[in-house]
């Protein structure tokens, strides 16, 4: 399947669009976003977002004691006449102090000074699932005893995440558990971008990096998080089913699972393993397999082993580029047949289209060395490799305009490094393969002993065998995540 030429497919660059929950309030939304840029005092901000002291301390105590019962918070009882002022938009903030270089701890301290120490959580000390179980559980316990202030705070709460894409995805994934537990509403999430790529942050208008003048920017960001509109975001479940006995070191976003399932009705080219291991997780932006993941894997290992070599964004990019060359991303076609390293040799791709229950086999072009399934408009620090496609090309290929909440993943391929480079500077679009509502990959070994994969920037090495296939199944999570729009 050939990608279009530049003139056929690419229009002027557009800001990614997301559907707003408040469809009738366009003027109201515009006004609120404009108000978010107005200078706001510390006192005004606190009045808008800070919880009453008795609830702040009760939530803290429940988390420390790992007990969500009302009794665990009884050390600070509500006032006899509970006339505590309910904040308009109560905020809870999660900070990854390892993000943002040396600024992470300072940003955490500034946040605590602005809205109270008890409303800012260090993710190295309090995990998001602990806050959800014990902190929100504490609020719900107060509300069940007739505390109207606690009830309103639980209903109005918003979350701010200060960190990179991985941190944001971690918090979103934990919040998604509230849907399964029928503990509604699920708080929407705002983003304070402290990571490297920050593609989630870019896609929802929070920017690609935090401003240099971060002290004043924090206050504006908190205010904007309390007034900006909310959008929906698809999330995607991934299940990897592999032969038992294979050893894999998965990223923290993948967890071991016993729920392995292989669709016997689907055409399988290899052999089904007699016994299996499984890993399961959720991603929000992209999953990829191939050379891009191999380069990312090498870079991440170097950064972990020798952090002093990757101490800033410029150094990171230089090292990343060096890995791209050393792994053969650029030079393979000069020294060998590029088809020998194409993913076609190890991978079979099946998809389901939107509103279809039938699997369809999709050919992988032999020149493609990386396949990416993309949910957002932003990949690789703000690039849009799928491109903004013209309507006639969309109709010709049977595609629809890509959105973050349309129930579809855009699948594209990258060839040798020069092709990837031109895609990344948006001179051309990637090699369009398909749009899919569900994906099944079958990978099998041979001359290749490992495949490299990554999910929202977290790479790993996936072992393969000659005898049995490994399967990767991707499907949409039924409940969408809620993200506050920053623009």
From Swiss-Prot:
Q: Does the keyword Cytoplasm apply?
A: yes
SUPFAM superfamilies cross-referenced by the UniProt entry: NAD kinase/diacylglycerol kinase-like (SSF111331)
Q: Does the keyword 4Fe-4S apply?
A: no
Principal cellular location given in the protein's record = endoplasmic reticulum
Q: Which GO terms describe its biological process?
A: defense response; phospholipase C-activating G protein-coupled receptor signaling pathway
Keywords, A to Z, come to: ATP-binding, Cytoplasm, Endoplasmic reticulum, Kinase, Nucleotide-binding, Plant defense, Stress response, Transferase
Q: Where in the cell is it found?
A: Endoplasmic reticulum; Cytoplasm, Cytosol
Q: What happens when the gene is disrupted?
A: Reduced plant size with small and curly leaves. Reduced growth rate of pollen tubes and reduced number of seeds. No visible phenotype under normal growth conditions, but the double mutants dgk2 and dgk4 exhibit defective pollen growth and seed development because of non-viable male gametophyte.
Q: Which residues form a coiled coil?
A: none
EC number annotated for this UniProt entry: 2.7.1.107
Tell me, what is one Gene Ontology molecular-function annotation carried by this entry? Answer: ATP binding
- Which GO terms of the cellular component aspect does the record hold? cytosol; endoplasmic reticulum
Any single Pfam family the record assigns to this protein: DAGK_acc
- UniProt cross-references to InterPro entries, sorted A to Z: ATP-NAD_kinase_N, DGK, Diacylglycerol_kin_accessory, Diacylglycerol_kinase_cat_dom, Diacylglycerol_kinase_pln, NAD/diacylglycerol_kinase_sf
Tissues where the protein occurs: Highly expressed in pollen grains. Expressed in roots, hypocotyls, leaf vasculature, developing anthers and stigmas, and receptacles of siliques.
- Catalytic activity entry: a 1,2-diacyl-sn-glycerol + ATP = a 1,2-diacyl-sn-glycero-3-phosphate + ADP + H(+)
Describe the task this protein carries out. Answer: Phosphorylates the second messenger diacylglycerol (DAG) to generate phosphatidic acid (PA), another important signaling molecule. PA is required for plant development and responses to abiotic stress and pathogen attack. May be involved in the accumulation of PA during cold stress. Involved in the regulation of PA and phosphatidylcholine biosynthesis in growing pollen tubes. Required for nitric oxide-dependent pollen tube growth and re-orientation responses.
Subunit structure, briefly?
Monomer.
Q: What is this protein called?
A: Diacylglycerol kinase 4
Q: Which organism is it from?
A: Arabidopsis thaliana
């Amino acid at each position: 399947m050939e990608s279009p030429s530049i003139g056929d497919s690419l229009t002027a660059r557009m800001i990614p669009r997301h559907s707003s929950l408040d469809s009738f309030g366009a003027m109201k939304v515009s006004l609120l976003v404009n108000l978010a840029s107005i200078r706001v005092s510390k006192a005004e901000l606190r009045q808008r977002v800070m919880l009453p002291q008795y609830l702040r301390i009760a939530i803290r105590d429940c988390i420390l004691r790992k007990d969500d019962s009302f009794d665990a918070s009884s050390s600070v009882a509500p006032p006899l006449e509970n006339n505590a002022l309910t904040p308009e938009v109560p905020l809870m903030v999660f900070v990854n102090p390892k993000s943002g270089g040396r600024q992470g701890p300072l940003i955490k301290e500034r946040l605590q000074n602005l809205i109270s120490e008890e409303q800012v959580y260090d993710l190295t000390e309090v995990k998001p699932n602990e806050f959800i179980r014990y902190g929100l559980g504490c609020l719900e316990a107060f509300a069940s005893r007739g505390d109207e202030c606690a009830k309103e705070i639980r209903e109005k709460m918003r979350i701010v995440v200060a960190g990179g894409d991985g941190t944001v995805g971690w918090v979103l994934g934990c919040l998604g558990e509230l849907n399964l537990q029928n503990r509604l509403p699920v708080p929407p999430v705002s983003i304070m971008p402290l990571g490297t790529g920050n593609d989630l942050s870019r896609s929802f208008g929070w920017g690609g990096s935090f401003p240099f003048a971060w002290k004043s920017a924090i206050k504006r960001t908190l205010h904007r998080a309390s007034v900006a509109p909310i959008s929906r975001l698809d999330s995607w479940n991934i299940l990897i089913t592999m032969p038992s006995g294979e050893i894999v070191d998965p990223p923290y976003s993948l967890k071991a699972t016993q729920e392995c399932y292989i669709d016997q009705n689907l055409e399988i080219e290899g052999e089904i393993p007699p016994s299996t291991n499984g890993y399961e997780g959720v991603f929000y932006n992209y999953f990829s397999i191939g050379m891009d993941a191999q380069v990312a894997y090498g870079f991440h290992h170097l950064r972990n082993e020798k952090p002093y070599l990757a101490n800033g964004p410029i150094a990171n990019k230089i090292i990343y580029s060096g890995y791209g060359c050393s792994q053969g991303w650029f030079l393979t076609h000069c020294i060998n047949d590029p088809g020998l390293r194409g993913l076609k040799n190890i991978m079979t791709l099946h998809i389901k289209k939107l509103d279809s229950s039938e699997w369809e086999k999709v050919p992988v072009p032999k020149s493609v060395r990386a396949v990416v399934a993309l949910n957002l408009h932003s990949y690789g620090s703000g690039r849009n490799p799928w491109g903004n496609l013209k309507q006639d090309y969309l109709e010709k290929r049977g595609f629809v305009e890509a959105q973050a909440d349309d129930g579809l993943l855009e699948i594209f391929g990258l060839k040798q490094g020069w092709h990837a480079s031109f895609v990344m500077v948006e001179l051309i679009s990637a090699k369009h393969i398909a749009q899919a509502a569900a994906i099944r990959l079958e990978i099998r070994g041979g001359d290749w002993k490992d495949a490299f994969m990554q999910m929202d920037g977290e790479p790993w090495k996936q072992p393969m065998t000659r005898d049995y296939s490994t399967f990767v199944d991707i499907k949409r999570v039924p409940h969408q995540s809620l993200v506050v729009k920053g623009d």
